[in-house]
Structure formats: C-alpha cells, structure tokens
C-alpha cells in the first residue's frame, strides 16, 4: 500500500485537494481490504476530500482475463453497510467538517441492493457526481423542486401542448425504475403527455453493463426501431455521448440515430428542470444549452 500512496503524499504536501475512487472487485479488494483502504485514505483528510467506492464493470470482452465474480443483491448490501459504518465513524471525528462523511457508495450499490438512496445531506455537496455518487438523488430532488415551483409550473402550463405529446426516454437498466417514478409524477401533473421509459439492453459491451453512459447508438437503433415511429421525440442523456461531441461510443452520431429511427433526438439530463423541459417539449434554458452544446457548435 505504501507504493500506491506515494502520489497522495506528494499532492497533500503540495497543498492540492484530492478526490479519490476505489474500484471494488468481489473477493479481491473488498471486506477487510476495503477497510484498510478507507483507513489509509482517510488519514489524508482534509486534503483528501472524498472517496467513492464503485463496483468493477464486467463487459463481455473477458477472454484471457482473470475471472471476476459480479456483486449481487446480498454482497452489495454488505458493501453499503461497511461504507455507512465508516461514514458514521469519520463524521464523528470532526477532522473535516466540510465533507465529514468522506467515503461514499455509488448509486449502483443501492440500486443493486434494492435499498433507498441516502438523504442529500450525506453526499457532502455531491463531490463525487462524476463517479455516479448521488446522481439519482440530485435528479430526483431537482425534479421535485421544479414541480413545486409556481413560476416553473406557470411557464410549463403555458408552453405544453394540451393536444398531446408522446416521447421515448432511453436509459440504461440501472436507472429505469427511478426514471419511471419521475415520469410518473410528470404524467400525473400533465396527463396529456405520455413518456415511455425504455431501458436499453447493452449488447455492445454485454448485459452486465447497465449504466446509461455506456449505451451505444447501434443498440438504440436496434431496440427502438419498433417504437420510435409513434413518438414525437427520443430523449437521451448527454452521458451517452463522448464529451464535447454528438458521437456515441460505437462512432455512430445522433444524426445517424435520427435518420435510422426517423425521429428527432433531444439531448438532455443536465439537471432536474431541464429533464422536465425535455419531457414536456419546452425550450431548454440558456444555461442548459450552454452546458450541453458549448463545444459542439
């Protein structure tokens, strides 16, 4: 472990703030090894602000590689219990009042274990969003806030086409049920809007890969060809595309998907209100347009 920690030593001594990630492999670096890792990394607080724990992603391309066992519902629950125990201990010692919980389980653990996501306060300001920690909680809270905003509701009621709208919302299997809950809120408020959540099976990387960010254009085309013709728009999260490009990981573009499915594609999911705007067919806010398109035009 001393070899692995020489970089944090140098960065801490240089006054650099750090956020870390641990990719957990079942039977290899979990259990007592995870305890040791968290203990070692927590000694770098407050320079080390947070550490995310994420499960290893197992694609179908594993010929010649060491065998790895995927986590299941029970083992994911054990990982959560272990991390939450560390959160309580670290928050109690008062070393870093800004990010007291320090170590965070990615959303995937909670969904795999069938558990409720932590409350917002435990994410310490969402320091690990890019590693999939708190994305679902943040999206849900932002959608709820927009649905409780009189100004947004007034704008939406004036903008939404009361003659009817049908959209397909494509996502990975991991977040399917959470998106169905959110879109259920939307359709209850605007019953003339129909939102069909379609979880895309990952044939490109393998069915064990369930995150939205690794869905390819080819998988979208093959699995939505039957339904796209009767929808007004296809919504996809910006995470499906390469950073700063309208290109999927299989080199197909959003234009390719539009052409094959004969349906407009809208890129969204930069926040709860923007998610609502996309579902309802409203114009994106200027800030959302900047975030999604700033390096595309």
Please provide the spans of the model-predicted regions.
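Well-ordered, non-transmembrane segments within structured domains
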Residues: 1-21, 185-201
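Charged helix-capping and loop-helix junction motifs
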Residues: 2, 35-36, 249-253
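Conserved C-terminal portion of the radical SAM core fold
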Residues: 5-64, 74-108
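Short, charged/polar micro-motifs that form catalytic or ligand-binding hotspots
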Residues: 24-27, 69, 169
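Short, hinge-like loop/turn segments at secondary-structure boundaries
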Residues: 37-38, 69-71, 283-286
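Short, flexible/disordered intra-domain loops and linkers
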Residues: 64-71, 244-247
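Short, conserved loop/turn and helix-capping segments at secondary-structure boundaries
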Residues: 70-77, 251
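Radical SAM enzyme core and accessory elements
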Residues: 113-297
């Amino acid at each position: 472990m001393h070899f692995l920690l020489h970089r944090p030593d140098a960065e801490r001594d240089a006054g650099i703030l750090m956020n870390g990630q641990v990719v957990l492999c079942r039977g290899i670096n979990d259990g007592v090894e995870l305890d040791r890792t968290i203990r070692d990394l927590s000694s770098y607080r407050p320079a080390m602000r947070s550490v995310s724990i994420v499960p290893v992603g197992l694609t179908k391309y594993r010929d010649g590689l060491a065998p790895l066992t995927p986590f299941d519902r029970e083992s994911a629950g054990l990982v959560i219990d272990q991390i939450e125990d560390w959160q309580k201990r670290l928050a109690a010692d008062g070393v870093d009042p800004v990010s007291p919980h320090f170590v965070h389980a990615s959303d995937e653990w909670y969904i795999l274990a069938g558990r409720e996501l932590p409350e917002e306060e435990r994410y310490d300001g969402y320091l690990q969003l890019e590693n999939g920690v708190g994305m679902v909680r943040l999206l849900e809270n932002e959608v709820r806030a927009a649905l409780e905003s009189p100004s947004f509701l007034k704008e939406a009621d004036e903008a939404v086409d009361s003659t009817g709208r049908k959209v397909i919302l494509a996502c990975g299997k991991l977040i399917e049920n959470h998106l169905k809950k959110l879109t259920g809120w939307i359709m209850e408020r605007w019953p003339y809007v129909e939102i069909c959540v379609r979880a895309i099976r990952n044939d490109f990387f393998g069915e064990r890969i369930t995150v939205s960010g690794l869905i390819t254009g080819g998988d979208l085309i093959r699995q939505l060809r039957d339904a796209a013709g009767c929808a007004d728009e296809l919504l996809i999260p910006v995470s499906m595309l390469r950073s700063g490009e309208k290109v999927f990981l299989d080199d197909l573009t959003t234009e390719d998907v539009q052409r094959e499915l004969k349906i407009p594609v809208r890129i969204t999911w930069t926040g709860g209100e923007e998610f609502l705007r996309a579902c309802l067919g409203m114009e994106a806010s200027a800030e959302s347009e900047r975030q999604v398109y700033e390096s595309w035009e």
